[in-house]
Amino acid sequence: FYVTGIRLSELIDIQIIDIEFYKKTIKVLGKRNKERIIPLSEVIIKTLKIFINEYKLKDFLFTDIKGNKVYPKLVYRVVKKYIGMISSINKRSPHVLRHTFATHMLNNGADINAIKDLLGHANLSATQVYTHNTVEKLKSIYKQAHPRA
C-alpha cells in the first residue's frame, strides 16, 4: 500500500498478468472498473519476481495457503499486526498506508494532480484531503523560521 498507494480492494485483485516487469508497471482496476497504471521501482520489480517464483504463483499475486485469492479481512489483519510491530499509532489499516503514501508524495514535492492519478481519484477534491498535513508542515516551518512568528 505504501509503495503504490493502491486500495485494499485493488491489491487483492492483482493478478500476475497485471504486472509488466519490463515496463516496471502494474495495472490495477479501481473504483467503477477504472483501470490505471502504477509505476514500480526496480527494487519492487526484483522483489516481486523473487516472491512469485518462491511461492510458484500462477494467477493472483496474493493468495492464502490453499492458493485462493486472499480476502480483505486477512490482509487487514496482517497489515494491522505489522504496523503495530513498528509503530505506536492507534490507526492501523491498509488505508493508513495509502494515506501516508499520498502525504509523503505531497510533502516531497509531487504535483497534486499526479497524486490524484496515482490514487485513482476521479476528482481533485478527494485528493485534497491529504493537503492538511502539508499545511501543518508549513505552519511548523513558519513558526521555526520566521522571526515574528
Give residue spans per PLM region.
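C-terminal catalytic core of tyrosine-transesterase DNA break-rejoin enzymes
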Residues: 3, 81, 98-122, 129
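Conserved tyrosine-mediated DNA breakage-rejoining catalytic core shared by Y-recombinases
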Residues: 4, 9, 13-50, 125
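ATP/adenylate-binding site constellation spanning eukaryotic-like Ser/Thr protein kinases
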Residues: 16, 41-45, 75, 99, ...
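Catalytic-site neighborhood detector that most strongly recognizes the C-terminal catalytic loop/helix
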Residues: 32, 125-147
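Active-site/catalytic core of tyrosine-dependent DNA strand-transfer enzymes
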Residues: 41-89
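Catalytic tyrosine of NAD(P)H-dependent dehydrogenase/reductases that use a Tyr as the general acid/base
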Residues: 91-95
